[in-house]
UniProtKB/Swiss-Prot annotation:
Entry function: Could be involved in mycobactin synthesis.
Swiss-Prot/TrEMBL GO biological process terms: siderophore biosynthetic process
Signal peptide extent: none
Protein family: To M.tuberculosis MbtH.
Name of the protein in its database record: Protein MbtH
Protein source organism: Mycobacterium bovis (strain ATCC BAA-935 / AF2122/97)
Gene3D superfamilies the record matches: Structural Genomics, Unknown Function 30-nov-00 1gh9 Mol_id (3.90.820.10)
A single Gene Ontology CC term: cytosol
Length: 71
C-alpha cells in the first residue's frame, strides 16, 4: 500500500498561494501547478503548517473578501 506524499511528516514541502490567497502544502519533488506560487519553504511539513496557520487567517477567497469590502 502506498502512502500519500502530502501526509509525509518527514518530507520537504513548499507553501503555495494562488490568486485567491488560498494556501496549499506541496511536496518539493512535485511540479508547481499553474496559477500557484511558492511563498514559503523548502521546509518541513510542520514548519509549513505553522506558516499556513499564522498567515492564512481568513479562509474566504480574495474575490469574496474584496466584494464584501465594497458593500
Amino acid at each position: 500500500m502506498s502512502t500519500n506524499p502530502f501526509d509525509d511528516d518527514n518530507g520537504a514541502f513548499f507553501v503555495l498561494v494562488n490568486d485567491e490567497d488560498q494556501h496549499s502544502l506541496w511536496p518539493v519533488f512535485a511540479d508547481i501547478p499553474a496559477g500557484w506560487r511558492v511563498v514559503h519553504g523548502e521546509a518541513s511539513r510542520a514548519a509549513c503548517l505553522d506558516y499556513v496557520e499564522k498567515n492564512w487567517t481568513d479562509l474566504r477567497p480574495k474575490s469574496l473578501r474584496d466584494a464584501m469590502a465594497e458593500d
